[in-house]
UniProtKB/Swiss-Prot annotation:
Provenance organism: Rattus norvegicus (Rat)
Bias kind Basic residues: ranges: 481-496
Family label: Belongs to the CEP162 family.
Described purpose of this protein according to its UniProt entry: Required to promote assembly of the transition zone in primary cilia. Acts by specifically recognizing and binding the axonemal microtubule. Localizes to the distal ends of centrioles before ciliogenesis and directly binds to axonemal microtubule, thereby promoting and restricting transition zone formation specifically at the cilia base. Required to mediate CEP290 association with microtubules.
Biased composition (Acidic residues): 192-204
TM annotation in the entry: none
Entry annotated with the keyword Cell division: no
Keyword set, alphabetical order: Cilium biogenesis/degradation, Coiled coil, Cytoplasm, Cytoskeleton, Microtubule, Nucleus, Phosphoprotein
Major localisation: cytoplasm
One Gene Ontology term from the biological process aspect of the record: cilium assembly
Residues carrying Phosphoserine: 156, 159, 468
Annotated protein name in UniProt: Centrosomal protein of 162 kDa
Length: 1403
């Protein structure tokens, strides 16, 4: 919907005040219509978008017309029926739209012409249209209704009644109704929306004015049936507050509210001298007086029946009662009583200060952020700052209607109850009964859901304070509203209503009421009001505040149309009370008297006019205060904006907490439901809960809808993306086409220039042409002149361009100079930076090398530690294993005495056996020597056996010894490395500590140097203190030195004693070591002897076997062969015996001697030639054997010599190793002594001496390293010089090679050029690829951001809709709770209510 800017609103407000002061009533009819025309042109948006029209600047727009509006008087009986019907429909979530309510200007003749007009076609058509409309509602076809067409049709239907009313009024304002009708139609382009989601804006923290006017209608319609409660009990249900979230369209002006409500319009009264219309001036024109006369005639006729229901049904009661209640509540408002006949605020009312006590309930204007959206800072200001003086009775209904939380309903119930006490006789006992019922229901709800009551305590406190104020009010003030209710006149002219369902017309048929009772009540009222409003002093408020009150005056006055007073709410806008001036009171009295006598007294009329002039002067005086109000407006506005922002943030935080708690509770509830469902299945085997199934179906349905929405968004995004691509392609094509066209145009331009050039310098052969061609000649001359002008222009351009060129050259030179300067500066800075970078690089390299060395050192240290740990682990394992073996041996063997006995016996047996074996060996050797004294194999065998055994045993022993010594040496080396490593660690630690100490000392020195000039003035006193302190320190130092010396002496004695003990231990250790060595040698000798014994036994067994075998062979040979054979066998045997000298032992010898067999052919004679051959053969064999023996002897001698040399070498090595081990052992002992001394001495002197010794050692080591490094540095410098020379030579050779290649052939040059071009092309290609990649990434990012924004927008929309659904469900739950409570208390519910409850449950 189109919006008015602030400037337009200010202009309209100025016009309105001008009209009030200048009596320009006719001109005022034209002014509001102009913006409406503009709005009608602008308002092309559909009805569902137009509902949120008031959200931009926070103001209510200018839909409020300041023209006179026509009013209709409706009978009460039809109102009650209509109210009940529409209220029940609204509570079920159905939007109720009557054909009557859709009209913008519904003008029906008043009760004066009720008899003349009769029932009329209009009423019958209304009934038919209502029936059709409700039938469509039941069928669910309300969304297809075109309400704008219905408005036009109904306006055309009502034109007849317009004419009737105008005729009856004497054509006082003929053009006014038409203008208003026109303006009203322009102001009401909106139609009702079925979608409650569009109607509610859940992020508004403050309730707007129009939002307040809507809820006020429902309770008042419900209270319209109170006069009939004694006869009908069903009228009580009108008190049930049913918040119709479908109709809660925010920021829509009053006429839009009037449309969807089918109730009769309540008529605010007009009494006294005040005019009912918003644009009427207070001048004394004849048209105004005639209109007043007609109004009082209507009053006289409409109040003919003055029964109690009639009085309560009159609209005057509501505003009067609201004024009286406002007097009882606020001390300041007691001076300003609003007259029931006018919606305009008085000057006193506009000047009222914004105070806390002028409001009703605190905290009610602060709605949570998630529920309603702030319309704007200005409207929030006006909403939170308006002084409200409307009755709390209807305020309680309004709060119940607006509030989405139970605590607000609790507030409203308490207020409703207090209001009921203030009303007095107009409030029957049934209302108190309903109040108690509401209190019980709301207590239960607040006890069940305490998380939804962040403002409960505050509201209850304020409501209790208001209740106590009500109870303390005097009884006379309570009775005033009932008296005033009898003097409520309906007016013939219609103006925007603030009562409940004020826009709906009813087709009732009530009788005109008598005017007599009205006059008596009116006189009483005016006489009382005169006494109360004499000493009213205007107080300045903000201009914006008063402007909003006047602009929204027709919308915000809610005098209860049906027996109910207007609501009084803190923070929500309502019509402020308007105090009556004495002139107004006298004007009322005068008017009533003139109406009583009707044309009787002329003087009263003159007095009335005089008082009207006085009122006009007061209004002009009030206009002067507007300037003062403007000054304070900006400050108030800023303060209110700040407060609104802080409240918004507070509400956002509270809402966030509530959402979190709600989410947790929902999760808990779902878990509880699942457990209860499982228990039910286990116990009864029932199926799942149908309610949860329905909820699941609803949730699935919502999820499907969301998915379809997302699919639609995705399709739309794809379509838009394809469109973007098409547009990009089209753009490229257009660029190519334009480029081609430009080229064509350039070519055409060149050709035209050439043609023009030719035309300029054509030969002057044209002179010889015939005179008929004079016209063409003149044309050519004109072209020539034009060309010359063009030429002149071009020459000027050339001059100008030359000048520009010179200027640009000057600038270019300047830029070049600047460039050269910048280059020089850059070179200078780069040189400095390069030098700094080099220094930093060198320092970095040094640091890196230092850290690498330290890292390497740590790595080596870790390796050593790992080795030590492995060795320690192995040693532990070995010790464990040995312990187990020892335990096993102990268990196997008995006591140590038995073991020693057994060992001694075994040793004795072994010794005897060894002696026996040695004796046998000696005997065998002696036998062999005796038998074969010169036998070479026996000698060699004896020598080899003896030598081998000795040699092998000694070699094994030496090898084992060498291995052991090597292992000890490696262990010593590792220990030495460890000690060196520990020394290095200590050195590094000391170095770090020394550096830290130096830094600390330097810092302290610098600090003291900085503090020195400051402390010079008190140096003398400090010096004395320091001297005394120094003396004390010296004494303490001497004492400590003495103590340390004593400790050193004691430690020296302890050290000597320990050294003595250490030496004793070392001697014992050395003796034990020698004993262990001797034991090891004895064991080795024993093992060697055992081995030799075993070898001798094996050799004896072999010899016995060979002897037996030879004997067998001999027997075989002797038995078979002849004497020749025997000789050969003897020779063979001799040979064998020579080869095996050991084969003859004692057993074999005894066998050869004693066991000879007899052979007869043994000693027979043989041939001499055979004997000679045998001798020759034996001699030759003997010579060979002798040669072989000599050879073996030489070899054995060489082996003996070699063995001796190796033994000497092994002995020398062993002696050297033993010497080194002794030296290492001594060093280790010294080290142990040093460690012991360090550990056992706590003296600082010994520690420092040790450190000094270590430092000296390290210094020597480092000096050696420095000397080595100096020598290496010299060689390094020489190598660097050599390397530089070689590098120069290499570069020179490469350049020569390159030049030779280039100058070699042209193909090579071409090849080199191609290589350069290829490199350039590759570089360009890479750059283009990078640019393309950047462009692609940018486009992707843009598309992704747009998609993300779109998705976030739709997500927010979905969240808003879900919150609105939750709100609506909570409202329905509260409504159903109220209805259930009514059922429980026995209230009879009609059929429509039951239908409504069933529909709500289905929802």
């Amino acid at each position: 919907m189109a919006h008015y800017s602030k400037v337009d609103l200010d202009e309209e407000f100025e016009r309105f005040m001008k009209e009030l002061s200048d009596d320009s009533f006719e001109n005022s009819n034209e002014t509001p219509s102009q913006p409406n025309k503009d709005r009608k042109k602008k308002d092309t948006a559909p009805w569902w978008i137009a509902e949120d029209g008031f959200e931009d600047d926070g103001l209510l727009g200018t839909n409020v017309s300041y023209l006179k509006t026509k009013k209709t008087y409706q009978p009460i009986t039809d109102m009650e029926e209509e109210n009940e019907k529409v209220q029940f429909l609204k509570s079920s979530g159905t939007s109720v739209l009557s054909v009557d309510s859709l009209e913008a200007n519904e003008l029906v003749a008043s009760e004066l012409h009720h008899s003349t007009l009769g029932l009329g076609l209009d009423t019958l058509e209304e009934q038919e249209e209502k029936e059709q409309f409700f039938a469509r509602l039941e069928k669910g076809l309300t969304s297809s209704i075109d309400y704008s067409k219905l408005n036009q049709e109904l306006d055309s239907d009502d034109s007849a009644q317009f004419r009737v009313l105008h005729r009856y009024q004497g054509n006082v304002e003929p053009a006014e109704g038409g203008r208003e009708n026109e303006s009203e139609h322009k102001e009401l382009p909106e139609t009702y929306s079925d979608d409650f989601e569009d109607a509610e804006d859940t992020d508004e923290p403050l309730i707007t004015k129009d939002e307040e006017t809507r809820p006020k209608e429902n309770p008042e319609s419900g209270k319209g049936s109170f006069p009939n409660q004694e006869e009908e009990k069903t009228g009580m249900l009108a008190n049930v507050v049913l918040l119709d979230s479908f109709d809660s369209v925010e920021d829509v002006d009053l006429n839009n509210h009037e449309r969807p409500t089918p109730k009769a319009k309540a008529l605010p009264e007009m009494a006294g001298g005040e005019l009912a219309e918003t644009g009427v001036s207070y001048g004394q024109s004849s048209g105004d007086t005639e209109a007043l006369h007609q109004a009082y005639h209507h009053v006289a006729h409409s109040l003919g029946d003055t029964g109690e229901p009639r009085i309560e049904a009159s609209p005057g009661h509501s505003v009067r009662s609201s004024a009286k209640d406002g007097l009882q509540e606020n001390e300041e408002s007691s001076k300003n009583i609003s007259t029931t006949e006018s919606d305009l605020p008085t000057v006193e009312e506009l000047m009222k200060p914004i105070r806390i006590d002028s409001y009703g309930i605190r905290g009610f204007d602060l709605q949570p952020v998630s529920l309603q959206k702030a319309v704007g800072s200005k409207e929030a200001e006006s909403v939170s700052s308006l002084p409200l003086t409307v009755n709390t009775n209807t305020m309680s209904q309004d709060t119940r209607h607006v509030s989405p939380f139970p605590h607000e309903q609790d507030e409203s119930v308490v207020l409703h109850r207090t209001a009921g006490e203030g009303v007095g006789s107009s409030c029957p006992a049934t209302e108190e009964h309903l109040d108690k019922m509401y209190l019980e229901i709301l207590r239960k709800k607040t006890s069940v859901n305490p998380s939804l009551l962040p403002q409960d305590n505050k509201a209850n406190q304020t409501s209790r304070s208001r209740l106590s104020a009500r109870e303390e009010a005097p009884v006379t003030s309570k009775q005033v509203p009932c008296k005033k209710a009898r003097s409520a006149p309906p007016l013939p002219r219609r103006k925007p209503q603030s009562g409940l369902y004020a826009s709906a017309r009813s087709s009732g048929y009530s009788k005109p009421s008598s005017p007599l009772q009205f006059f008596s009540a009116l006189e009483k009222k005016t006489s009382k009001d005169n006494t109360k409003t004499k000493n009213v002093r205007p107080i300045p408020t903000s201009n914006q505040f008063r402007k909003r009150e006047i602009l929204s005056g027709t919308k915000l006055i809610k005098p209860a149309a049906l027996n109910k007073p207007s609501p009084h709410r803190e923070g929500s806008p309502a019509t402020p009370k308007r105090p009556e001036d004495p002139s107004d009171d006298s004007f009322v009295q005068l008017q009533t008297e003139t109406l009583g006598s009707y044309g009787g007294n002329r003087e009263k009329e003159l007095l009335m006019l005089k008082r009207a002039q006085d009122a006009e002067e007061k209004w002009r005086g009030a206009q002067a205060l507007i300037e003062q109000i403007k000054m304070t407006f900006s400050e108030k506005e800023k303060e209110l904006e700040n407060t609104v922002e802080s409240l918004k943030r507070q509400q956002e935080r509270e809402l966030f907490k509530l959402n979190q708690e709600n989410y947790i509770l929902q999760a808990k509830l779902s878990s509880f439901e699942e457990t209860s469902r499982k228990q039910r299945w286990l116990q009864f085997g029932e199926t799942s809960d149908p309610l949860t199934e329905e909820k699941l179906k609803q949730i699935q349905k919502e999820i499907q809808e969301q998915e379809t929405l997302l699919q639609g968004y995705q399709q739309e995004n794809e379509r838009l993306y394809s469109q973007v691509k098409d547009l990009q392609e089209q753009n490229k094509k257009n660029e190519e086409r334009m480029f081609k066209e430009n080229q064509n145009l350039f070519s055409e331009l060149a050709s035209l220039k050439e043609q023009m050039h030719k035309n300029h310098f054509l030969p002057q052969a044209v002179e010889n042409i015939e005179p008929t061609k004079n016209q063409s000649f003149t044309d050519l001359l004109a072209e020539l002149r034009a060309a010359q002008k063009e030429k002149n222009h071009l020459m000027e351009d050339i001059k100008r361009l030359k000048q520009d060129k010179q200027a640009l050259e000057v600038d270019l030179e300047r830029v070049k100079r600047e460039r050269d300067q910048a280059k020089d500066q850059i070179a200078y800075t780069t040189g400095e930076k390069l030098y700094e970078i080099k220094i930093l690089e060198e320092t970095h390299k040094q640091e890196v090398s230092r850290l690498q060395k330290r890292l390497q050192w740590y790595a080596e240290n870790q390796e050593l530690l790992d080795k030590d740990a492995a060795r320690l682990r192995e040693a532990n394992e070995e010790t464990e294993r040995l312990k187990l073996e020892i335990e096993k041996l102990k268990t196997e063997s008995g006591s140590p005495a038995n073991q020693q006995r057994l060992r001694s016996k075994e040793r004795a047996l072994d010794a005897k056996r060894i002696q026996d074996l040695e004796r046998q060996v000696k005997e065998m050797e002696g036998i062999l020597k005796r038998r074969y004294p010169n036998s070479l194999p026996a000698l060699i065998l004896a020598a080899s056996a003896a030598g081998d055994s000795v040699d092998r045993n000694t070699v094994d022993f030496m090898e084992r010894r060498i291995k052991k010594l090597e292992a000890d040496l490696e262990g010593k080396d590792e220990e030495a490395k460890k000690s060196l490593r520990t020394m290095e660690q200590q050195f590094q630690k000391m170095k770090i500590q020394y550096e830290q100490r130096l830094e600390e000392q330097e810092q302290m020195l610098a600090h003291r140097q900085r503090e020195a000039p400051q402390n010079q003035h008190n140096s003398s006193s400090r010096l004395k203190a320091l001297e005394t302190e120094l003396g004390g320190i010296k004494e303490a130092h001497q004492i400590t030195v003495r103590k340390l010396e004593a400790e050193i002496d004691v430690l020296k004695h302890q050290n000597a004693h320990l050294e003595h003990k250490k030496n004793d231990k070392e001697d014992q250790d050395l003796q034990s070591i020698e004993f262990q060595v001797e034991q090891a040698q004895a064991r080795a000798k024993l093992a060697r002897l055992n081995e030799e014994l075993a070898a001798k036994g094996r050799e004896i067994q072999d010899l016995t076997k060979t002897v037996e075998r030879l004997q067998k062979e001999r027997r075989m040979m002797l038995s078979r062969q002849s004497p020749r054979g025997r000789e050969e066998m003897a020779a063979k045997r001799l040979k064998k015996e020579i080869l095996h000298p050991n084969s003859g032992n004692a057993n074999a010898f005894s066998e050869t001697l004693g066991a000879k067999l007899y052979h007869p052919h043994t000693f027979t004679d043989s041939h001499i030639s055979e004997v000679l051959e045998e001798n020759y053969r034996l001699r030759s064999e003997l010579e060979g054997l002798t040669l072989e023996r000599e050879k073996l002897k030489m070899e054995s001698e060489a082996a003996v010599c070699q063995l001796e040399s190796s033994m000497k070498r092994v002995k020398d090595d062993a002696a050297a190793h033993i010497a080194s081990l002794k030296a290492a052992h001594e060093r280790e002992i010294e080290k142990l002594l040093c460690q012991n001394a360090v550990e056992n001495s706590s003296s600082r002197v010994a520690e420092l001496n040790r450190k000094i010794a270590t430092q000296e050692v390290l210094l020597k080591h480092f000096q050696g390293q420095v000397n080595e490094l100096q020598g290496k540095q010299e060689s390094l410098s020489l190598s660097q010089v050599r390397e530089e020379i070689l590098q120069k030579q290499i570069t020179k050779l490469l350049e020569e090679l390159k030049e030779a290649k280039e100058n070699h052939t042209p193909e090579m040059k071409h090849f080199m050029g191609l290589e350069r071009k290829i490199k350039q092309m590759e570089m360009r290609h890479k750059q283009r690829e990078q640019e393309l990649q950047q462009i692609i990434q940018q486009t992707r990012q843009v598309v992704e951001t747009e998609q993300n924004k779109e998705v976030e927008k739709w997500k927010r929309l979905a969240q808003l809709k879900n919150r609105e659904l939750d709100k609506f469900r909570t409202e329905l739950d509260s409504i159903l709770d109220v209805l259930r409570e009514l059922h429980r208390q026995g209230v009879v519910v009609p059929v429509a209510l039951a239908d409504e409850e069933s529909t709500a449950k289905e929802f």
